[in-house]
């Protein structure tokens, strides 16, 4: 009886530690995102990498998620050398997951996203890499059609490329709205950086399609929700205010 009790206590302690780590990661990725802080993303990713158990799928997926957010910001900042290093690292971890779970939808999606990051490194390969990226994201979506992060990435695959390479901001908006709806239905909006990014991209779609007043209202709503959302306050809201005049 005593041995069973000790095993139970150990299991509870392990579960609590895992939950605390997940909560910390959620808070830290959220903070790095709203502050638009590349260094914070880097430190978080390095720390997560040091603590990752590469035999554990959940641990690997948390690390890949850090690389995903960190590399997204590096790509936006056009830090190409760092992007290239991160792609190599992340793809190595994704390969470990897919070797164990070939139909892991989130890992397949991550593979598609990191392929898309490589487009900025070699424009000559943009058509081939872009097509490969879209195929992977579409495959992930066929496995998990209501996964909000995969819906988000499907939207990104339509938002960022020019029209000649399949870009379509109106279609992107539909996927962003679907992802937003899923997150809100799940009650998962608190300290969720993907949710804030989705709302930001919804507003950017409005701007890109001439709906400037709607964009301005959504940016203002975002700042009401998160006053420290740096890029909205410094860049996107002023642009929308000017465009709406």
Residue ranges of predicted features:
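N-terminal leader/linker segments that initiate helical-solenoid repeat arrays
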Residues: 19-77
């Amino acid at each position: 009886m005593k041995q069973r009790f000790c095993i139970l206590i150990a299991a509870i302690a392990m579960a609590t530690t895992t939950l605390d780590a997940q909560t910390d990661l959620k808070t830290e990725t959220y903070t790095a995102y709203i502050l638009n802080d590349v260094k914070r993303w880097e430190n978080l990713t390095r720390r997560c990498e040091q603590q990752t158990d590469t035999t554990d799928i959940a641990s690997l997926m948390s690390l890949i998620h850090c690389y995903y957010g960190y590399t997204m910001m590096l790509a936006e900042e056009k830090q190409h050398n760092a992007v290239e290093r991160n792609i190599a690292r992340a793809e190595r971890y994704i390969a470990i997951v897919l070797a164990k779970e070939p139909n892991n939808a989130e890992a397949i999606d991550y593979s598609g996203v990191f392929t898309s990051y490589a487009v900025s490194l070699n424009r000559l390969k943009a058509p081939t890499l872009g097509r490969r990226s879209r195929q992977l994201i579409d495959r992930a979506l066929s496995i998990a059609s209501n996964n909000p992060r995969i819906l988000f990435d499907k939207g990104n695959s339509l938002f960022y490329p020019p029209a000649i390479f399949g870009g379509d901001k109106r279609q992107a908006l539909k996927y962003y709205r679907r992802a937003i709806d899923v997150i809100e239905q799940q009650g998962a909006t608190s300290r969720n950086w993907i949710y804030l990014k989705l709302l930001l991209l919804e507003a950017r779609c409005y701007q890109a399609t001439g709906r400037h007043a709607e964009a301005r209202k959504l940016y203002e709503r975002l700042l009401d929700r998160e006053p420290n959302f740096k890029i909205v306050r410094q860049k996107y809201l002023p642009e929308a205010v000017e465009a709406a005049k």
